[in-house]
Amino acid sequence: MERRVAIVTGGLRGLGRTMAFGLARDGHSVLAVGHIDADVAEIEAATAGTNVSGHILALVADLRRPSDCDRVVAMARERLGTPQILVNNAGLTFTTIDPARFRRPEPQKFWQVSDDIVRAVIETNYIAADQMARRVAPEIVAHGWGRIINVTTKLDTMNRPHTSPYGASKAALEMATEVWAKEVAGTGLTINIVNPGAGANTPGMAEEMRQMSREGRVPRLVEPDEMVPPLLYVVSRAADNVNGCRFDANLWDLSLPPAEAARRASRPAGFEMHPQPG
């Protein structure tokens, strides 16, 4: 296994934290980026008590700011080496858009969401990912090997009513993945998506939804650890020719060889629009 330098955004909590530790356990050097200062000490303590063959550094940054994206890439390069893997996981969820959605008599309409929330969600879920990708891609292409992995969501979450602008932000990143993958074809950089494939059991999920899942009233939530096997496959040399795909973790079959599990859990990134009439 070749050791690589990885940046995981949204890497101090939830899915990102689990993916950061998964990469480190696989021997990679990881810069985990989040936005809450208290999480840094927790990551450092967890790293000290965990058997990882790689290394994890924790950093607080606001990736909506171009200057902070520059700082993240510079720190990775200075402390760990040239970034070869970027996991764009940072995101704001429904609990940010409408914290009281399960306590409202009527669901929130898109025009009731404040300008500040709309801007924060779009900037965090799409623009931050775009900014980070544009900063690491040139060096990866120059070196001839690397990975960008975006975390989006499933289509029926993107187009679900009363969740705007979450779906729009993830749809933008989904389509960007398709476009970017076409542009880097043949360069050694691949760009793919790794998704839970269903709601994820993280603090970003409303507690009411987590409780309903525990009671069996809604489908099972995906555990963060389920993201690690598809992620490790995508960053491996076995996936050198895998580009422009999305992998849903809830479809990954651990009983199969990774390449076969990947084949069954994957489909092309992006969308097929409704056909023209006639």
Task: Say what each PLM segment does.
Residues 26, 140, 158, 179-189, ...:
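Active-site-adjacent segment of SDR/Rossmann-fold oxidoreductases
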Residues 193, 210-278:
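C-terminal helical subdomain
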Residues 26-42:
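Conserved glycine-rich Rossmann-like NAD(P)H-binding loop of the short-chain dehydrogenase/reductase
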Residues 133-134, 178:
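A short, exposed helix-loop element centered on a Lys and neighboring polar residues
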Residues 60-72, 115:
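The beta1-alpha1 cofactor-binding region of Rossmann-like NAD(H)/NADP(H)-dependent oxidoreductases
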Residues 92-93, 104-117, 147-172, 177-178, ...:
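Catalytic loop of short-chain dehydrogenase/reductase
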